[in-house]
Amino acid sequence: MDRHSSYFFIWLQLELCAMAVLLTKGEIRCYCDAAHCVATGYMCKSELSACFSRLLDPQNTNSPLTHGCLDSLASTADICRAKQAQNHSGPAMPTLECCHEDMCNYRGLHDVLSPSKSEASGQGNRYQHDSSRNLITKMQELTSSKELWFRAAVIAVPIAGGLILVLLIMLALRMLRSENKRLQDERQQMLSRLHYSFHGHHSKKGQVAKLDLECMVPVSGQENCCLTCDKMRQAELSNEKILSLVHWGMYSGHGKLEFI
């Protein structure tokens, strides 16, 4: 008992450690347009809590953008630090930018990095930021609803499968019981027929044996054939088409029957 309790406490401590690691290890969701993110709704989770947006062609400022989690890059977050230092030191257009909020890289790279040059541009950026936030919120709600339906399906499908399996087992048991009952009825009928035929055959056989015994015993020393017995035997066995082939011979004084 003590051994099992010690195992239980060790397992509980391991579970608590794993939960603590998961809680301390932050993850954020990022917009991802890579091929491997299509199945996950164009989203990925970053264990480094960093998303990126960059130009596919650094030499062309109008180049299309690519987005994703920083974990998918070859290096770590040092790329973001180096690029940030380069961005602050020179006026050149940056080719990569990192952010650390959920779906923060959904906006374009130019919208994220371009500073507001005037009050009008600041208001436009603020309006675009609000609209992008609303879009991000809608995407998160859609993803949450998809996850909810997926969890419901994961729970409902095994339950439905179990119910179908139980119904199939009950149907199979019912079929087996009906088949067993039918076989028992057929067996009972067969046994009844055999019983009746066996007893009827023995009763007829007993009557024939009794008639043979009466015919074998000589009556008052007569030496002629037992014609009366033969007639009685023929009358009894007329239904079965059996004829008596036994003819009694002369009865000698030594008590022996001789057949002719």
Curated annotation (Swiss-Prot):
Listed GO MF terms: frizzled binding
> What InterPro entries does the entry give?
BAMBI, BAMBI_C, BAMBI_N, Snake_toxin-like_sf
Q: Which residues lie on this side of the membrane: Extracellular?
A: 27-152
Task: Supply the Gene3D superfamilies for this chain.
Answer: CD59
User: Which UniProt keywords are listed?
Assistant: Glycoprotein, Membrane, Signal, Transmembrane, Transmembrane helix
Q: Which residues form the signal peptide?
A: 1-26
* Localization of this protein: Membrane
Q: Which residues cross the membrane?
A: 153-173
Residues modified by glycosylation: N87
Spell out which residues lie on the membrane's Cytoplasmic side.
174-260
- Topology class, membrane: Single-pass type I membrane protein
Give the UniProt entry's GO cellular component terms.
cytoplasm; membrane; plasma membrane
Q: Which family does it belong to?
A: Belongs to the BAMBI family.
* Biological role: Negatively regulates TGF-beta signaling.
Question: Would you tell me the protein name for this molecule?
Answer: BMP and activin membrane-bound inhibitor homolog
Taxonomic path: Eukaryota, Metazoa, Chordata, Craniata, Vertebrata
Gene coding for it: Bambi
